[in-house]
């Protein structure tokens, strides 16, 4: 892989996503001891509680393929992924009832967070790593910083509506904005027509994603495609509680300038489809739910959904930012 964080931590992320998609707990049990061993590896490549190296003569990348020179520090990014993976393993423990591991893992995560704050947080500004290349989004995603941290991040992207981030920061910035009530800004970044944008690729004739914002090297590389899932998770609002798509929640986050959308995903339980049209202060929904699941529409209240097709017309909530 390319580094100990964004690449190596797939050892936990892949089985976790498999569990979420299919509800199969056995994959978590299979990988839990392997992830613990990987944590030993990360500890052996850490200094002052920051991951600083990989195997000798191997890459130790942090974020990758930023449009301009990479300045976000590699140990900051790798510790972010270490902490996020500890949190994933805590989810393993919850599902598998491995409460014996929780105190040690919780303490480990707190140590790693403290190292990030100690090394990279500026108490005068509220920024991490000077808020470069999405750094504040990494911190906010871990619950670090203060109110200024997120506010400074939002201000930066309101003033610079293009991605200055690499393959990880692009994903994290977009998700953090959607999750924290700034769907419109996330949508503006996704549809930006500035120099480093998905539109710019399209405008120059690309039919696949290049490896770099600047078109270097491969012209068919999937790694910037992580944000595509947010079209379904946030814009259409197709989410789930639990695992295996047995408890479906439709919770769209509307963005100014986007008045209609339609799409579907094929889950372990069957196809889930959503269409919405916003007009004259109301939202018309058409939602299809598969058999054998619980489901609800979480918009303007909570509306139970049984198997089949449902059509709603609801007053629009004034929450888009």
Regions found by a protein language model. Give the residues of each.
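Alpha-solenoid helical repeat architecture
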Residues: 164-171
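Long, well-ordered core segments of solenoidal/helical folds
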Residues: 31-51, 107-125, 144-163, 181-201
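Carbohydrate-binding/catalytic loop surfaces
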Residues: 1-6, 10, 22, 51-77, ...
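Generic beta-strand/beta-sheet core signal
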Residues: 45, 54, 131, 177, ...
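Active-site acid/base region of carbohydrate-active enzymes
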Residues: 6-9, 13, 21-80, 93-138, ...
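Non-catalytic C-terminal accessory modules of carbohydrate-active enzymes
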Residues: 184-321
């Amino acid at each position: 892989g390319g580094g100990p964080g964004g690449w190596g931590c797939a050892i936990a992320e892949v089985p976790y996503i498999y569990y979420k998609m299919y509800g199969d707990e056995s994959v978590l049990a299979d990988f839990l001891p392997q992830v613990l061993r990987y944590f030993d590896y990360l500890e052996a490549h850490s200094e002052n509680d920051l991951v600083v190296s990989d195997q000798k003569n191997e890459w130790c990348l942090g974020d990758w393929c930023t449009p301009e020179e990479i300045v976000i520090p590699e140990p900051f990014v790798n510790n972010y992924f270490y902490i996020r993976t500890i949190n994933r393993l805590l989810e393993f423990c919850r599902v598998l009832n491995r409460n014996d591991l929780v105190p040690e893992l919780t303490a480990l995560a707190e140590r790693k967070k403290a190292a990030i704050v100690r090394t990279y947080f500026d108490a005068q500004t509220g920024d991490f790593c000077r808020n470069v290349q999405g750094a504040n989004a990494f911190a906010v995603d871990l619950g670090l910083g203060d109110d200024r941290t997120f506010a400074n991040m939002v201000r930066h992207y309101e003033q610079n509506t293009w991605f200055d981030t690499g393959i990880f920061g692009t994903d994290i910035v977009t998700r953090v904005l959607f999750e924290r009530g700034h769907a419109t800004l996330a949508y503006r970044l996704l549809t930006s027509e500035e120099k480093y944008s998905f539109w710019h690729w399209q405008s120059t004739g690309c039919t696949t994603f290049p490896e770099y914002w600047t078109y270097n090297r491969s012209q068919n590389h999937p790694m910037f495609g992580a944000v595509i899932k947010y079209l379904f998770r946030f814009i259409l609002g197709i989410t789930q509680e639990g695992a295996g798509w047995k408890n479906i929640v439709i919770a769209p986050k509307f963005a100014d300038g986007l008045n209609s959308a339609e799409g579907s995903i094929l889950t372990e339980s069957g196809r889930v489809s959503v269409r919405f049209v916003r007009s004259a202060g109301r939202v018309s929904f058409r939602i299809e739910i598969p058999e054998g699941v619980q489901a609800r529409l979480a918009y303007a209240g909570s509306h139970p959904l049984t198997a089949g097709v449902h059509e709603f017309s609801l007053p629009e909530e004034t929450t888009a930012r």
